[in-house]
C-alpha cells in the first residue's frame, strides 16, 4: 500500500481523519480486565489503551501483557449455606454473607449470626 513500507505519521493521521477515523490515547489506565464466560479473566496491568472512533462506533485497543486469572472458588457449598441458615435461624442470603466473611468457617458463621 505504501512504497517502502514507510509513511509519515502526520500523513497517516490526516488520511484517517479523511476516512472518518479518530483515535485518542487514554492516559492513566492502571488495569484492564476482560471477564470470560468460564469465570476466568484476562488482566492487563498498566496497559496502553487507545480509543478509536470509526463511523460513529467506538473501539478500544488494549496493548500490554495479559495474565489469565482463574475464577475464585467459594470456600463453601450451597449445602453449607443451607446448614448455616437452618442452624442460625436466618435467611440463606444472610448465611452466605456470614460464610463469605468467615472464609467458609461454618461454626464461626453460625456463632456470629446467633450473636447478632
Swiss-Prot record:
InterPro entries: NAC-like_UBA, NAC_A/B_dom_sf, NAC_arc, Nas_poly-pep-assoc_cplx_dom, UBA-like_sf. One of its GO terms (biological process) is protein transport. It holds the Pfam family NAC. One of its GO terms (molecular function) is RNA binding. Keywords: Protein transport, RNA-binding, Transport. Residues 6-75 form the NAC-A/B domain. Transmembrane segments: none annotated. Contacts the emerging nascent chain on the ribosome. Belongs to the NAC-alpha family. Homodimer. Interacts with the ribosome. Binds ribosomal RNA. This is Nascent polypeptide-associated complex protein. It comes from Methanopyrus kandleri (strain AV19 / DSM 6324 / JCM 9639 / NBRC 100938).
